[in-house]
Amino acid sequence: GPSAPRRVFISNAMLPMASEVHTLLVPIYGDSSGLSASRIGLILGSFATATFMVRLLTPWISRRLNEHQVLTVALFIAGAVYLAFPFLRNAGTLMFLSFVLGIGLGAGQPMVMAILHTHAPPGRMGEAAGVRMSLVNSMAVAVPLLFGVVGGTFGLAPVLWSVGVCLTTGGWLTRRANAGPSP
């Protein structure tokens, strides 16, 4: 399988992707669901609130779970939210899902940096951080373009489900990699 730094880079690409898709598609999805702009803003705000709150709890969380466990849970939470999103249209429910997504992504992103720091070859942390930033910035450009085309062609549900499957698969791979080699 992929080396530890490569797995970290893959996970690192998934988390910003999930955040970008949320920011891009919630307004479109909310509008197509008949929600007002203020309700859509509340949905986006619930995501930001959860992200902020969980970041305040990061020291407490990291004393109880290791980075790989937090990242695994974050990917599974985010994947489950994206898989459920297309089935729901109520503003309150979407606010709740966005809040849960904010918890997952907010907890996972700092752990990626901790894992990257742990697995970067000695003396190459700057290089690893540079590759990470290049990847994150590339995702910020590519994801809206790609999913905009897919969503415009096939609708929003396949985009949301695809993101959910990617994140859930990432959680499974992260959990499997953290479990070590099979006997």
Regions found by a protein language model. Name each.
Residues 42-51, 136:
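Transmembrane alpha-helical segments of major facilitator superfamily
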Residues 54-66, 151-152:
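Helix-to-loop junctions at the C-terminal end of transmembrane segments
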